């Protein structure tokens, strides 16, 4: 069974892909199968992915004041996907915020630029106090 970390990696990848080209249900299924995310974890990944997309405008409203000049164009697509997922989890899940931020930092180390972990930590830590 896939770990929660692997599920988060897959969700970030789907969010990133969706920024470039809207993700189809077929692509989503094939991608999750390729990553060996199945059964309950697959349902969890699909549900979270859909909910992040459904709440994208609300999440971006919360993120905007914490970005330099409120400018999303200066944030890489991978980093933005990690921020959206982290913020979604902080706002809508029961998981401890410190755990969510730590997980987002780990995702940034694996998937983002060299400066991404520090950036992700700074933004989510500031937002944590507002939620």
Curated annotation (Swiss-Prot):
Pfam families: NusB
A GO MF term: RNA binding
This protein's record includes keyword Phosphoprotein: no
GO biological process annotation, one example: DNA-templated transcription termination
One Gene Ontology CC term in the entry: cytosol
Keywords: RNA-binding, Transcription, Transcription antitermination, Transcription regulation
Classification via Gene3D superfamilies: NusB-like
Family of this protein: Belongs to the NusB family.
Alphabetized PANTHER family for the sequence: ANTITERMINATION NUSB DOMAIN-CONTAINING PROTEIN, N UTILIZATION SUBSTANCE PROTEIN B-RELATED
Role this protein plays: Involved in transcription antitermination. Required for transcription of ribosomal RNA (rRNA) genes. Binds specifically to the boxA antiterminator sequence of the ribosomal RNA (rrn) operons.
Annotated NCBIfam families: nusB
The protein's name in its UniProt record: Transcription antitermination protein NusB
């Amino acid at each position: 069974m896939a770990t929660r970390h692997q599920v988060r990696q897959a969700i970030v990848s789907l969010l990133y892909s969706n920024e470039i080209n809207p993700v189809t249900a077929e692509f989503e299924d094939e991608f999750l199968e390729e990553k060996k995310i199945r059964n309950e974890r697959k349902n969890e990944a699909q549900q979270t992915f859909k909910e992040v997309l459904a709440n994208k405008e609300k999440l971006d409203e919360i993120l905007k004041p914490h970005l330099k000049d409120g400018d999303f164009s200066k944030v890489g697509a991978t980093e933005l996907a990690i921020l959206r997922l982290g913020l979604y989890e902080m706002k809508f899940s029961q998981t401890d915020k410190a755990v969510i931020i730590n997980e987002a930092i780990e995702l940034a180390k694996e998937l983002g630029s060299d400066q991404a972990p520090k950036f992700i930590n700074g933004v989510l830590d500031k937002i944590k106090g507002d939620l």
